[in-house]
From Swiss-Prot, chains A, B:
Keywords: Antiviral defense, Endonuclease, Hydrolase, Magnesium, Metal-binding, Nuclease. Gene3D superfamilies: 3.30.70.240. It comes from Korarchaeum cryptofilum (strain OPF8). Mg(2+) binds at residue 13. This is CRISPR-associated endoribonuclease Cas2. It is an enzyme of class 3 (hydrolase). The gene is cas2. InterPro entries: CRISPR_associated_Cas2, Virulence_VapD/CRISPR_Cas2. It holds the Pfam family CRISPR_Cas2.
Amino acid sequence: MRGGNLKVLVVYDITDDSLRLKVAEILKDLGLFRIQKSAFIGEMTSQERENMEEILRRQNLGPSDRIDVFPICDRDLKMHSQIGRGKFGRGPP
Amino acid sequence: MRGGNLKVLVVYDITDDSLRLKVAEILKDLGLFRIQKSAFIGEMTSQERENMEEILRRQNLGPSDRIDVFPICDRDLKMHSQIGRGKFGRGPP
């Protein structure tokens, strides 16, 4: 979360409960904000993004598991909509 | 999915099974592609996006439910990463 202005959205679909919790912990530890049970958003440098993806790739994902990392520019983030009042954590968006 | 070049990612966190399934059906019917159990992506005009959000707002979401709609420009979509081999449906990304 230091420097850089690359915002990334990380969304995952992981079947195993303990692995799913582990991935959530990894993302929290990397300074991302939780916006949904399985979605985090954060700001990081390209190098930090690479490191994060390397850590995520090392996890023992099942055959139907998937993690998607989307960079989102500020312009797009401004056009984000939230429907429903569910709230996780703090911070953007 | 006709015209326009606004790509949107829709990610949701809905507790009730039947409502979650209903939202998935709505998004499929609107022509979006499923990329995860609770994430769809599609291309639509601004008007189609407004209509979609209006339909989603009419659903009886619970207090902790939340649907996030992120426009994603082509430049950002190109920098998208997928980790894991889980695959839903067809189409981008």
